[in-house]
Amino acid sequence: MNKKLLRARRALKLRKKLYLLGSVRLVVYRSLRHMYAQIVSEDNCNVLVAASTTEKLIASKLRVTGNKEAAAVVGQVIAERAFKKGIVHVSFDRSGFKYHGRVQILAEYARQFGLKF
C-alpha cells in the first residue's frame, strides 16, 4: 500500500466517527504548496466557512504559502470567519494527516482565535 491510500483510509475512518457525532467539522487539507481549511455542516452538504492560501487576501500576507507561517494565518482567518457566522464548537477533521507540523499549527491558531474542539 502506498502513502496516499493509507491516508485516505485513515480519513474515512475518522470521518465515519465524526459523522456519527453529528457535529460541524473543521476539515483541513494540505498540499506541498497550499493549506486549505473548511467548516462543513453536520449533514456534510454545505461548506459554511472556508479559508486557504490560494486566496489573494491571505497569499498577499505571505512570502511562501506552504509553510507553518501560512498554516498559522489560515488557522487565524478560519477562526475569525467562523466566529462572525456564530460557529464556536467544531470537530477537527485532519483528513488522515498526522497531527504534526502545519496541521498542528493550523489547529493551535484556530483554537487561539476562538474555535473550540
Swiss-Prot record:
One BP annotation, GO: translation
Transmembrane segments: none
Record keywords, A-Z: Ribonucleoprotein, Ribosomal protein, RNA-binding, rRNA-binding
A GO cellular component annotation in the UniProt record: cytosolic large ribosomal subunit
SUPFAM superfamilies (alphabetical): Translational machinery components
Gene Ontology MF term list: 5S rRNA binding; structural constituent of ribosome
Subunit structure: Part of the 50S ribosomal subunit; part of the 5S rRNA/L5/L18/L25 subcomplex. Contacts the 5S and 23S rRNAs.
Function: This is one of the proteins that bind and probably mediate the attachment of the 5S RNA into the large ribosomal subunit, where it forms part of the central protuberance.
Family indicated by similarity: Belongs to the universal ribosomal protein uL18 family.
The protein's name in its UniProt record: Large ribosomal subunit protein uL18
Originating gene: rplR
